[in-house]
Amino acid sequence: MEMDEKSDILPRVLEAAKKRRLYLPHALRQMNRPNRMISTGEVRLVIEDGEVIEDYPEDVRGHSCLMLGHGESGRPVHVVCAPKNDYLAIITAYIPGEKEWSDGFSVRRKP
């Protein structure tokens, strides 16, 4: 994917996040798993300081993207989000695994 395609959604993500962040039930369940415990502050850091690593323009929930950033302790965190007119939908958040991701957790490994 070209960088232009991925960077196209970032300004919309940031603008929507300024208005409101809405955590979908799935995101809250994933964030609160005992082996993850991802805080809303960590999600905010990923959105504000992270990078778009995958873009999903055809997502049935609306155009969304996968962002990589680092949480409060420096651990890598992935956040899938979708900008809407009045808010940013947080679809899920998780700690990426080395088996599934390479290049600093920014490139999905081929199966």
Predicted ranges, named:
Residues 1-111:
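Ribonuclease/tRNase effector modules and their secretory precursors
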